[in-house]
């Protein structure tokens, strides 16, 4: 996934009200841009740290740009725009880059299913059945550790998705929880039980029910992002 036009660089002044970030560009221009991340962004940003943003020329937009990448306090690069995860995964699926999910004959997005009226990110159609794939974007890293964690804030919605996948898995349907790790320098992923023990428990129960758990790491730069390697999942 290439950024077109290329991202612009700035320094973070502050993030506030979840959806807003004040930044300063190298030429001294102060901008308020959109922050497309509803999580805590814990360990994912630092005031004064480098950020990269996409600029919009759409006169209908109230804000001139969107925060895309951040240099973390640990010196890693993170894609903070969670809306990038699904297109990034779809690109990898269509390219055959996710070895466990190749050979499908059809791909459907945002399909409603389950008793709790959820929407799964992707349904992959195979000659012998369908695979339900739920995607989560991971950006929570820690100093001196190559292990990232999810979530960075409590997420009942995430636990609900796992419950729904578990129901299908018990019925013999192939279900996959796929962690899209948009953070450089990572070798493995784990549930952040210290932040959301309910989600961690839901993940363990989903695995026991037969839900597959995959994690793929991204190669990130201000020019492009792409999923390049499978990562270990530590349950």
From Swiss-Prot:
Transmembrane segments: none annotated. One of its GO terms (molecular function) is DNA binding. Gene3D superfamilies: 2.40.50.580, 3.40.1350.60. CDD domains: SfsA-like_bacterial. InterPro entries: SfsA, SfsA_C, SfsA_N. Pfam families: SfsA (PF03749), SfsA_N (PF17746). Belongs to the SfsA family. This is Sugar fermentation stimulation protein homolog. It comes from Azotobacter vinelandii (strain DJ / ATCC BAA-1303). The gene is sfsA.
